Amino acid sequence: MNLIAKLEQEEIERALAGKTIPEFAPGDTVIVNVNVVEGNRKRVQAYEGVVIAKRNRGLNSSFIVRKISSGEGVERTFQTYSPLLASIVVKRRGDVRRAKLYYLRERSGKSARIKEKLVSKDRAAAASQE
């Protein structure tokens, strides 16, 4: 492993200190809690939506979350290892066949729905034991 890769790995470990980022994929509905600083106040803002893209580039990894806010589509890009991310919670697993769900931008209503991924009983039992 070269020097830059080692430095990036150290930065990732430092950014993850005390935090765990769950496994999630495009199509999943997630709640991203973001630390927001307004003047001298600090608060946590929740942003819930569907992951439409995930970019795995080491320290530069990011993901895009799309939600509908008062009838208007809103997309927000988050850096995976940002210190501003308080936590990520996977609310629902989506069953999709694409890595990038940009086609959801043109869709609205029922055509923009995503099927829920069903987990077999064997895997559910194994996951609950861990």
From Swiss-Prot:
Query: What would be an example GO MF term here?
Result: structural constituent of ribosome
The alphabetical list of record keywords is: Ribonucleoprotein, Ribosomal protein
Ribonucleoprotein in keyword set: yes
Q: Which GO terms describe its biological process?
A: translation
Q: Can you supply one Gene Ontology CC term for this chain's record? A: cytosolic large ribosomal subunit
| One Pfam family cited in the UniProt record for this chain | Ribosomal_L19
Q: Which SUPFAM superfamilies match?
A: Translation proteins SH3-like domain
* Family matches, as PROSITE patterns: RIBOSOMAL_L19
Cell membrane keyword on record = no
- Function, as annotated: This protein is located at the 30S-50S ribosomal subunit interface and may play a role in the structure and function of the aminoacyl-tRNA binding site.
Family membership, please give it. Answer: Belongs to the bacterial ribosomal protein bL19 family.
Q: What is this protein called?
A: Large ribosomal subunit protein bL19
Source organism: Burkholderia multivorans (strain ATCC 17616 / 249)
